[in-house]
């Protein structure tokens, strides 16, 4: 048995002496125990295309923040490479990729810019809405070959405050306010939640609305994720939505569970909780990519900047910087390991025709929320080491930290509420009636 793993040879020391300090290690720590068996050729292709676009994504990030949305040019590029088809059914021109593909694509986008990752989150809603009744789906995909951007965006779909809908012949009269409609400028349809009434019956539903029926408020002024295009959409006067564009949330589990009999592709083999867990995977994979992108810039800047104190020629030569680099890398790799493990598990359960329990989902949600926070902690550590130069708006590294804080404020990602929800399961207490990382069950 060789001792090379534990004892460095003179050759090792000679080789190390020839390496420049602070070189960025591109090869990630191994994170998969299944050898990436759920990664598809199409998923790899899209990931590689995004990597090629990364310089453009980063170059446009500051302007996108000022405009409140990604540029038309970038949206067109994402459309060209097939980003907005990733979770659509093959039968309607989509790719129907599984959770591992989704995770890798989201991570690659996050390395460039968080809001670019968020536009993919918007597009991934096709996984759910494609399971709705056929007439709605036919209308949704009518422009799939010509539309530039995501086919659908959504606002306040599961929120406590939504729109209203009252029954009329052949449809519904709808009005209301739908907040956080991410991607609304580039979407062909807008989905929104409604409290509906039909005589003595009432409940929660979703409606597919034409953007022309809505007014967009210029209210997306935030400290991070400014380019996510998350304006509020309103309709102060009632407008008509046909029956075909209305979905009763009571039927949501039945719709999602029917997907495997309607469509091919791994995305549609996942059942209700597996589908919802995939959204959580996507969310946190964006954060992992952001932390990896932040690390790239951290290494670059640490090797090109002089510290305020102590008197080293470069920030990278400070012991505290070296410790921070090691800790940050370990935090990011640990987060990636957890999320990819869940992605692979979701795909495995989907191929076996099973689903997860409520307890499985709640624990998975808190695990992924926790490692999402770990990514933010790693980014904060790197920013702190770089000092005041890292908070200048002209320095792109600061955007990762700001965007990370806003993402983790999302209701489906907040650590403490998710901990309480999971804790009730773990302690054997009666669980809350919730699903999808803490959303109220509105069925």
Per-range role (PLM):
Residues 177-220, 229:
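DPxDG-like acidic metal-binding loop motif
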């Amino acid at each position: 048995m060789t001792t090379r793993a534990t004892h460095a040879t003179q050759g090792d020391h000679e080789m190390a002496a020839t390496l420049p300090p602070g070189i960025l290690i591109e090869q990630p720590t191994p994170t998969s125990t299944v050898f990436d068996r759920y990664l598809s050729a199409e998923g790899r292709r899209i990931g590689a295309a995004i990597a090629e676009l990364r310089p453009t994504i980063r170059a446009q990030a500051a302007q996108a923040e000022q405009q409140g949305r990604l540029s038309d040019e970038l949206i067109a590029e994402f459309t060209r490479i097939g980003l907005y088809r990733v979770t659509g059914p093959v039968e309607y021109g989509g790719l129907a990729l599984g959770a591992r593909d989704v995770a890798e694509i989201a991570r690659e986008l996050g390395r460039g810019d968080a809001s670019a990752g968020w536009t993919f989150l918007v597009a991934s809603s096709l996984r759910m809405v494609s399971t709705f009744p056929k007439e709605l789906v036919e209308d949704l995909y009518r422009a799939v070959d010509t539309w530039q951007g995501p086919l659908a965006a959504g606002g306040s779909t599961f929120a406590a405050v939504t729109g209203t809908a009252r029954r009329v012949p052949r449809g519904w009269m709808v009005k209301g306010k739908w907040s956080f409609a991410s991607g609304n400028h580039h979407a062909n349809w807008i989905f929104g939640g409604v409290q509906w009434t039909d005589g003595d019956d009432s409940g929660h539903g979703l409606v597919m609305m034409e953007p022309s029926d809505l007014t967009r408020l210029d209210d997306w002024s935030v400290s991070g994720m400014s380019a996510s295009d998350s304006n509020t959409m309103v309709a102060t006067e009632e407008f008509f939505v046909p029956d075909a564009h209305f979905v009763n949330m009571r039927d949501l589990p039945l719709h999602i569970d029917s997907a495997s009999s309607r469509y091919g592709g791994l995305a549609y083999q996942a059942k209700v909780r597996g589908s919802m867990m995939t959204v959580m995977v996507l969310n946190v994979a964006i954060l992992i990519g952001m932390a990896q992108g932040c690390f790239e810039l951290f290494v670059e800047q640490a090797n090109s900047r002089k510290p305020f104190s102590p008197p080293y020629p470069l920030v990278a030569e400070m012991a505290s910087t070296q410790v921070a680099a090691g800790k940050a890398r370990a935090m990011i790799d640990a987060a990636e390991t957890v999320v990819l493990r869940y992605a692979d598990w979701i795909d495995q359960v989907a191929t076996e025709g099973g689903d997860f329990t409520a307890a499985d989902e709640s624990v998975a949600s808190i695990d992924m929320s926790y490692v999402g926070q770990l990514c933010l902690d790693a980014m904060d550590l790197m920013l702190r080491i770089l000092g005041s130069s890292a908070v200048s708006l002209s320095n792109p590294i600061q955007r990762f930290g700001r965007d990370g804080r806003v993402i983790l404020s999302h209701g489906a990602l907040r650590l403490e509420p998710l901990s309480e929800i999971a804790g009730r399961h773990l302690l054997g207490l009666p669980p809350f009636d919730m699903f999808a990382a803490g959303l109220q069950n509105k069925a």
